[in-house]
Amino acid sequence: MTFALGQRWISDTESDLGLGTVVAMDARTVTLMFAASEENRVYARNDAPVTRVTFNVGDVIDCQEGWSLKVEEVLEDEGLYTYFGTREDTQETAIVLREIFLSNHIRFNKPQDKLYAGQIDRMDNFVLRYRALQNQFEQHKSPMRGLCGMRAGLIPHQLYIAHEVGRRHAPRVLLADEVGLGKTIEAGMIIHQQVLSGRAERILIVVPETLQHQWLVEMMRRFNLHFSIFDEERCIEAFAEAENPFDTQQYVLCSLDFLRKSRKRFEQALEGEWDLLVVDEAHHLEWSQDKPSREYQVVEGLAERTAGVLLLTATPEQLGRESHFARLRLLDPDRFYDYDAFVEEEEQYAPVADAITSLFSGEKLPDEAKNQITELLSEQDVEPLFRIIESDSDEEAKASARQELIDNLMDRHGTGRVLFRNTRAAIKGFPKRNVHLMPMDIPQQYTTSMRVSGMIGGKMTPEARAVKNLYPEEIFQEFEGEDSSWWQFDSRVNWLLEKVKEKRSDKVLVIASRASTALQLEQALREREGIRATVFHEGMSILERDKAAAYFAQEEGGAQVLICSEIGSEGRNFQFANQLVMFDLPFNPDLLEQRIGRLDRIGQKRDIDIHVPYLKDTSQAILARWFDEGLNAFAETCPTGRAVYDKYSDALIEMLASGDVSNLDEVIEESAKMNKELKSQLEQGRDRLLEMHSNGGEKAQQIVEKISSTDGDTNLVTFALSLFDTIGLNQDDKGENALVVTPSEHMMVPSYPGLPYEGATITFDRDTALSREDMHFISWEHPMIQGGIDLLMSEGVGTSAVSLLKNKALPVGTILLELVYAVDAQAPKRSGITRFLPKTPIRMMMDARGNDLSPQVEFEGFNRQLSPVNRHLGSKLVTSVQKDIHSLIEAGDALVEQKVEEVRKQAHQDMQQSLNAELERLQALKAVNPNIRDEEIESIEEQIKELTGYINQAQVQLDSLRLIVVSHN
């Protein structure tokens, strides 16, 4: 291949990029700029997947300025073409057009050229291509796009929040659901929608160090989003590729600590030009008016430079209104600038909440409530609605009038658009916790080793001593060596063996603080009783943990017991189990809540049993009593636990380190009192209005119904299997709704998108995918389907075919020509064009006279009457009627224009309807709710203008065609 600057080439693999221009070359590579889609590509010079663009005499070509030229002569000079000819619009002759000025939007790879050249595809490939176009079109138009393909149960409040926020331009919100309600999943769904719609291409997730793997796994397992963890080591490696290591990946995950410690890395992250920033555990960002913490400043710096920001926090505002304000200030500093003004404004929402409560109850509205509503909304808006509510209209009309009032009030509610918070109290469907505390005698061996350790302990801080005393088995091993079998005499192990045997039919999750303890417990279960158990700890790779989790999840032949270490269990959920054993206790209430949260989550079908075996007169006994009597943390979620712990931690550490429990009762009593006070403050301050808004009510149910109606789509299964067949993947039925798909030697391409080298087990069933983490959940949004469709399109599979129609009612040799056109607007993905004008297939069925029969001849039914022909015979048939085909394509091209106009018109209508409604709503709200940002309104106005241009320029192209010949035998 010889390249020269200014030459025009087209990509073989990505024909939708438009026409490319050579803009740079060196000895090994060539760079092409595709102006139509605002993309650049760098290829290896010797095997670049591109084709040189040359036109011949008689062709009509478009210039960038919008006029067309009919070519009469072509000259080549130093590798560049110049075209001479007549302008189509002014009829001027001897016009010169150099190839550098050719329109960027020109397309190639005509299916008719393939047909004439005898490159005839199989009939079933033509069918697959048409179905791919059809399905892709429907998926892009679906308002639920981005929500159907995730591996998660359909939980109304999560879907509502994700749907509400995911569609916004550059969303800036605070997700503050209580523990166990699935904030990570909500954030993942929002990210997924933003990625699919093209609104977010570069994403940075900042989390505490211990949660990095959890996020990595959740994003990959649930949403097929592959993030890269960045730490110092990774940045040094990446430096070889780019000056700023953050530029080497689109999806980056790093810890807050990493950015805090290194100013250099923080500054590089600031220059990363992110579209979306996600910060987990945002309640750890300390802020006060005089002195914000370094962590807070790091996040503030990133939030100022990033359009979209999601903050996740589990702490309710009543425990720290100031810190709550600080979080909102990160999202919108112009709006939340003064803490005192914020407090005052918050207090004005009480009447809104009262008004909404009376609307929700469905009772007659008292005058007081009416006056409050009229004050908040303008009179002309509410009067007609009041009339409907009080008239004898049918219940449905009343309900919808009520809902409209509620929606309007919600919109005007101060933080309704910025803050979402669901509480367990407001969401039903949580299991009951049955707590079993079991004090046990301490073995003599432990008493001795702990006494000796105390005597020779040397200088240790009280905190280190307190932690050490919690794990007597480790102290024993310090004296007796790592291999000492403490599990032969530990009374907790004896109890555990009996419990597991007693619960033969139940899955048991055991959590211990240390990985070494977990490994030795597995050995004890195996060697002493032959019980099938598997281990899960931080020393294992993600793949090994997946395998362990899958082994535990298996109904038949799986492990009965899974033993986790503290860190190993983070972020994993085992809702299918309901027996939890805490072999020891963690040091703080947050970790305790996390442990219970492995089973006690939304989606848990049964009540859970929490077993806490502990050794009498040890540190564990102190903690067990404090957690149970001081916080009631085993039986209920404990949002207040951290605040109580912070106050009494010094006293607790002192007791755990010294073993002196003389004032334990007093600490427990005071803790219980403080806990009760904080909880009642929480209950009184519950923002009912916010809860009503956050759980989405009716709307949330409708979203669930829409998505569940697409689950189990047989159309998807049929399509996926044909797709895998065509591309050449091996498929083995595994039973239980599962298939194993592996690459084969005769594949169309060296590697299949989204499929690991060793293959994958897939399922189309959501419930199976939820209980088996080792399976891929296949939906229309999965990379294996999306990538497969892109592959079909780019490889030109099924663009031309020939079929026979056995029908004695028609004369032998009658021909029909099936034409499939695609209307496509070339525009950057982030413009949001696919919502209104995705690639749209238009099918036409031309008879020999040039009439379109497609309205009478439905695709699937007609296709069943056809039979395939081999390539040799097909080629002969094409040659014999080539002239007719040519004139039928011309007739089709003329007829399709009108249909394209209809498609454009519909796209305009959809776009205007959707965006104008949103624009009017925001403009009306801006007058009463300062939470509407100017950028949001400007962005929609800009989007309407941009999209109008793109839709007007949408082009139609013949995508594929099939010649059909009538035969009688």
From Swiss-Prot:
InterPro entries linked: Helicase_ATP-bd (IPR014001), Helicase_C-like (IPR001650), Helicase_RapA (IPR023949), P-loop_NTPase (IPR027417), RapA_C (IPR022737), SNF2-like_sf (IPR038718), SNF2/RAD54-like_C (IPR049730), SNF2_N (IPR000330)
Pfam families, per the entry: Helicase_C, RapA_C, SNF2-rel_dom, Tudor_1_RapA, Tudor_RapA
Keywords in alphabetical order: Activator, ATP-binding, DNA-binding, Helicase, Hydrolase, Nucleotide-binding, Transcription, Transcription regulation
GO molecular function: ATP binding; DNA binding; helicase activity; hydrolase activity, acting on acid anhydrides
EC number, UniProt record: 3.6.4.-
Binding positions (ATP): D177, E178, V179, G180, L181, G182, K183, T184
Domain Helicase ATP-binding: 164-334
CDD domains noted in UniProt: DEXDc_RapA (cd18011), SF2_C_SNF (cd18793)
UniProt superkingdom: Bacteria
Enzyme class label: hydrolase
GO BP annotation list: regulation of DNA-templated transcription
Ranges where the Helicase C-terminal domain occurs: 492-646
Residue ranges annotated as motif DEAH box: 280-283
Subunit structure as annotated in this protein's UniProt entry: Interacts with the RNAP. Has a higher affinity for the core RNAP than for the holoenzyme. Its ATPase activity is stimulated by binding to RNAP.
Function: Transcription regulator that activates transcription by stimulating RNA polymerase (RNAP) recycling in case of stress conditions such as supercoiled DNA or high salt concentrations. Probably acts by releasing the RNAP, when it is trapped or immobilized on tightly supercoiled DNA. Does not activate transcription on linear DNA. Probably not involved in DNA repair.
PANTHER family the UniProt entry points to: DNA ANNEALING HELICASE AND ENDONUCLEASE ZRANB3 FAMILY MEMBER, SWI_SNF-RELATED MATRIX-ASSOCIATED ACTIN-DEPENDENT REGULATOR OF CHROMATIN SUBFAMILY A-LIKE PROTEIN 1
Family, per entry: Belongs to the SNF2/RAD54 helicase family. RapA subfamily.
Name the record gives this protein: RNA polymerase-associated protein RapA
Organism: Vibrio campbellii (strain ATCC BAA-1116)
